[in-house]
């Protein structure tokens, strides 16, 4: 491996794909993880209609397309579409030849072994990567925060995980997964807005609601209190202009949707909220390391970007934990991209260069090599 070839770092999330070069401080390309196919037969010859669109292009033509997400709940479910996304990443977004750069991909905690092998196979056989590595998302977020011990509460668009990490190793027995994340909150907001008389049904309209969520929603420190405030005055109301110029007003929906993170019953789910899940995850760890975990609760992922979430998390976790424990919530401002940033740090370390899984090793041992090299 010569020094000058930068590794490519690709963080494939359920909602967004983040890609760029190792050593950079932010991803060059961030685009939706979607593949769209035309709903209707094209009538105008020579319009150059493609049979599929990826990312932003699919997003901008969403009115005429059926959109599919190849990654559900953090795990790849549709490999053909996933290949399209990777192809788009290399050739259209980063404009690089994948056969010239080592590739670092990220995976969800507890990703099935077969998936990991399939990823490896596609990178080496379809894209001819010279070297490859796959790393667990939460571990990278922790690296990005400059720690080697802590518990990461990583919540993206499709899935939320709590991952305790001690001295750089994740503790699989204590990892908890919660199928409640950004996409569900968008659904929750759609439901709340429908009660107000605004209807959003198509995949395209759903993207509008996602934007409303990202711009206007926040987490209340005290939900009941906030509901009373909202009922008594219009101070919490905000307006939002839809693409067609219509203006809608949104009040208590602003904090009712994100509240589902702490009270999943709002979505009809029987699971524990993110605060309880974090607590349960810590509780599954050895007594001796719990203090270190409580003192380093790192938030990561786009769904942790709601204003007020860190304070609320601090409050809820403090009330669950033993009184002698000092709870510290770490919410880095760049946490939306901290998985990618961690990958960028890792792939550019000189000590990491001999950990890559090379094409030669793959040719000798097959996809199973990934379990021996990447852990």
Curated annotation (Swiss-Prot):
Its EC number is 3.6.4.-
* Top-level taxon of origin: Eukaryota
Reply yes or no: does the keyword DNA-binding apply: no
Q: What's in the GO CC field?
A: cytoplasm; cytoskeleton
**What Gene3D superfamilies does the annotation carry?**
3.30.420.40, Actin, Chain A, domain 4
Q: List the disulfide bonds.
A: none
Q: Which UniProt keywords apply?
A: ATP-binding, Cytoplasm, Cytoskeleton, Hydrolase, Nucleotide-binding
The record's section on Pfam families has: Actin
Top enzyme class: hydrolase
Q: Which chemical reaction does it catalyze?
A: ATP + H2O = ADP + phosphate + H(+)
Q: Which InterPro entries match?
A: Actin (IPR004000), Actin/actin-like_CS (IPR020902), Actin_CS (IPR004001), ATPase_NBD (IPR043129)
Question: What's the family?
Answer: Belongs to the actin family.
The name under which this protein is listed is: Actin-2
Q: Which organism is it from?
A: Suillus bovinus
């Amino acid at each position: 491996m010569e020094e000058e070839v930068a590794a490519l770092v690709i963080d494939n999330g359920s909602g967004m794909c983040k890609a760029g070069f190792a050593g950079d401080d932010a991803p060059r390309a961030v685009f939706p993880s979607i593949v769209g196919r035309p709903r209707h037969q094209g009538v105008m010859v020579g319009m150059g209609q493609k049979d599929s669109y990826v990312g932003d292009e699919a997003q901008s033509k969403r009115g005429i397309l059926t959109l599919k997400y190849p990654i559900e709940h953090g795990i790849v479910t549709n490999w053909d579409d996933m290949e399209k996304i990777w192809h788009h990443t290399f050739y259209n977004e980063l404009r690089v030849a994948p056969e010239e750069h080592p590739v670092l991909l990220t995976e969800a905690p507890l990703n099935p072994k077969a998936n990991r092998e399939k990823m490896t196979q596609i990178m080496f056989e379809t894209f001819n990567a010279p070297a490859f590595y796959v790393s667990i998302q939460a571990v990278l977020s922790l690296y990005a925060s400059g720690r080697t011990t802590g518990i990461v509460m990583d919540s993206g668009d499709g899935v939320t995980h709590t991952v305790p990490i001690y001295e750089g190793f994740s503790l699989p027995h204590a990892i908890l997964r919660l199928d409640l994340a950004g996409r569900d909150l968008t659904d929750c907001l759609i439901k709340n807005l429908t009660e107000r008389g605004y209807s959003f049904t198509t995949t395209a309209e759903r993207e509008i609601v996602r934007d409303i969520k990202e711009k206007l929603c926040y987490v209340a420190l005290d939900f009941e209190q906030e509901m009373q405030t909202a009922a008594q005055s219009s101070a919490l109301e905000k307006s939002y202009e839809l693409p067609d110029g219509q203006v809608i007003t949104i009040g208590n929906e602003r904090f009712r949707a994100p509240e589902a993170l702490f009270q999943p019953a709002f979505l009809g789910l029987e699971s524990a909220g993110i605060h309880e899940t974090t607590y349960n995850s810590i509780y599954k760890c050895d007594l001796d390391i719990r203090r270190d975990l409580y003192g380093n609760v790192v938030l990561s992922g786009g769904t942790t970007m709601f204003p007020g979430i860190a304070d609320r998390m601090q409050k809820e976790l403090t009330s669950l934990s033993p009184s002698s424990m000092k709870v510290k919530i770490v919410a880095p401002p760049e946490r939306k991209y901290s998985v990618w940033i961690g990958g960028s740090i890792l792939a550019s370390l000189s000590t990491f260069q001999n950990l890559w899984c090379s094409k030669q090793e793959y040719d000798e041992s097959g996809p199973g090599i990934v379990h021996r090299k990447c852990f």
